[in-house]
């Protein structure tokens, strides 16, 4: 059983690349905005961000372009959809089960501190004694 579990784990973590992804990755090394434009479109947020990165700094534009190609790959989307179909459902509805308040609420900024009520309020400026001249 452990062997089947290991093989299933290896299969889930593998990522195969197709020829379009490979071509866009190579293109991303030389002209990163073109690779992002081919995947996302001309006036998309990622394309404009990559163009800005390309004009200011070349290396981050390459990393961003490779990330966009990886995230939008058809092979990756197929793998993720298959993973979600076989994964057990987890109830993570936080509104249905709100967290209990275990700590007391801190006082608001406009409230006076009752513990230090006998101490006169002072500003943070240094006070010069009136005896000095």
Curated annotation (Swiss-Prot):
Main location: membrane
Region ranges (Disordered): 89-133
Membrane topology: Multi-pass membrane protein
Compartment(s): Membrane; Late endosome membrane; Vacuole lumen; Cytoplasmic vesicle membrane
Lumenal compartment spans: 38-48
Highest taxon in the source lineage: Eukaryota
Keywords from the UniProt entry: Cytoplasmic vesicle, Endosome, Isopeptide bond, Membrane, Transmembrane, Transmembrane helix, Ubl conjugation, Vacuole
Cytoplasmic topological domain: 1-16, 70-133
Sequence ranges of Polar residues compositional bias: 124-133
Chain segments annotated as transmembrane: 17-37, 49-69
Signal peptide: none
Protein name as it appears in the record: Protein SNA3
Lineage: Eukaryota, Fungi, Dikarya, Ascomycota, Saccharomycotina
